[in-house]
Amino acid sequence: MATYKVTLINEAEGINETIDCDDDTYILDAAEEAGLDLPYSCRAGACSTCAGTITSGTIDQSDQSFLDDDQIEAGYVLTCVAYPTSDCTIKTHQEEGLY
């Protein structure tokens, strides 16, 4: 099992934290364990409440069923069903940008 550094940022929310996240742990779960309060609703990859955008690194969100290919190509990630596959940086609270 690998552990990656996941940096979560959002200037408007005052978030700039780097957390450790195992490659078999969802990023949202690791953030909550680290004491961060990120938005979420379904926790199943079927809505957009937890959406963020990945600015560097790679993730696996194959469990999600909400985002279309264009949104994924644009860097959107559902943190509730995303595993890190490298060190990465994610901008949080990006649901509004999807619409």
Curated annotation (Swiss-Prot):
UniProt-listed SUPFAM superfamilies: 2Fe-2S ferredoxin-like (SSF54292)
Species the sequence originates in: Arthrospira platensis (Spirulina platensis)
Pfam family, one: Fer2
Function per UniProt: Ferredoxins are iron-sulfur proteins that transfer electrons in a wide variety of metabolic reactions.
Cofactor binding remark: Binds 1 [2Fe-2S] cluster.
Name this polypeptide is given: Ferredoxin
Alphabetical UniProt keywords: 2Fe-2S, Electron transport, Iron, Iron-sulfur, Metal-binding, Transport
Gene3D superfamilies: 3.10.20.30
Biological process per Gene Ontology, one example term: electron transport chain
CDD domains (UniProt xref): fer2 (cd00207)
Names of required cofactors: [2Fe-2S] cluster
Binding-site residues for [2Fe-2S] cluster, renumbered to this chain: C42, C47, C50, C80
Domain 2Fe-2S ferredoxin-type: 4-96
Family statement drawn from the similarity comment of this UniProt entry: Belongs to the 2Fe2S plant-type ferredoxin family.
A GO MF label: metal ion binding
InterPro entries assigned: 2Fe-2S_ferredoxin-like_sf, 2Fe-2S_ferredoxin-type, 2Fe2S_fd_BS, Beta-grasp_dom_sf, Fd_pln
PANTHER family in UniProt: FERREDOXIN, FERREDOXIN-2, CHLOROPLASTIC
